[in-house]
Design a protein with these regions (language model features):
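A generic alpha-helix surface/boundary motif
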Residues: 18, 31-32, 54-56, 78
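Extended, low-polarity transmembrane helix blocks
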Residues: 1-22, 64-136
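Core segments of alpha-helical transmembrane spans in multipass integral membrane proteins
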Residues: 43-63
Length: 136
């Protein structure tokens, strides 16, 4: 396995571990101040419990090679909701954006086709060729 793939897998495992152990488990377990924190965000603890389950599912999908792309798309959507929630209540919102970027970078390092799609836009070859001739 190449060094690039190893780095991608290390980032992926660390990210999934963070999602499961630092984020989802906080939604699934009881702790002091949990209800107040979630109420500030506009969610009750029942909804947060369900979100924790979904978060674990997405983290697992992200780690399985056959479902990693869909898992990353779902993770991005989930983190978009987290970003919007934090913006709405005036909390710092950069963390979910950084996590989403790390997820896409990790997936791209694991599977170079992800970066290829982003850079080469394979489904718009004519448009890309026109843009390339204009810039030269």
């Amino acid at each position: 396995m190449s060094k690039t793939k190893v780095v991608g897998w290390v980032l992926s495992v660390l990210l999934a571990a963070f999602l499961i152990f630092a984020s989802a488990l906080g939604k699934l377990t009881e702790w002091e101040g949990k209800q107040d924190m979630f109420a500030k965000l506009g969610w009750d603890t029942g909804v947060m419990y369900n979100i924790g389950i979904v978060e674990i599912g997405i983290a697992v999908m992200f780690l399985i090679p056959r479902t990693a792309f869909v898992g990353t798309v779902l993770l991005t959507a989930y983190l978009g909701g987290a970003t919007a929630t934090h913006v709405r209540v005036g909390d710092p919102f950069i963390a979910p954006i950084v996590v989403a970027l790390v997820a896409w970078i990790a997936l791209g390092l694991r599977d170079g086709r992800v970066f290829g799609m982003a850079i080469h836009c394979p489904n718009c070859q004519v448009a890309c060729d026109k843009d390339a001739t204009r810039s030269t």
